Amino acid sequence: MAVPKKRTSRSKKKIRKNVRKGKAYRAAIKAFSLAKSISTGHSKSFYCIVNDDSSGSSESKLTAIDLDDP
């Protein structure tokens, strides 16, 4: 079994910890920004398939998600 020869220094631990926290922070900012754009209706990258049952046909069309409609 591989065993480390020397103890990892505190500064190296802090650097690695801050790198991990930074990656998580950037991922959270990106997710929040994406959620905000979807909720405001300004998203250009999310589409969903909507079945149009009101006309009696089974046609489906591709439309952008609009969360303001009831």
Swiss-Prot record:
Task: Please give the family membership noted in the entry.
Answer: Belongs to the bacterial ribosomal protein bL32 family.
UniProt cross-references to Pfam families, sorted A to Z: Ribosomal_L32p
Is Ribosomal protein there in the keyword field? yes
At the top level of its lineage, which domain of life is listed? Answer: Eukaryota
Intracellular or extracellular location(s): Plastid, Chloroplast
Q: Which GO terms describe its cellular component?
A: chloroplast; large ribosomal subunit
Which BP terms in the Gene Ontology apply to this protein? translation
| One Gene Ontology molecular-function label | structural constituent of ribosome
Q: Where are the compositionally biased (Polar residues) regions?
A: 52-61
Native organism taxonomy = Eukaryota, Viridiplantae, Streptophyta, Embryophyta, Tracheophyta
Q: What protein name applies here?
A: Large ribosomal subunit protein bL32c
The segments labelled Disordered in the record are 1-20, 51-70
Organism from which the protein derives: Pinus thunbergii (Japanese black pine)
Q: Does the keyword Oxidoreductase apply?
A: no
Which keywords has UniProt assigned to this entry?
Chloroplast, Plastid, Ribonucleoprotein, Ribosomal protein
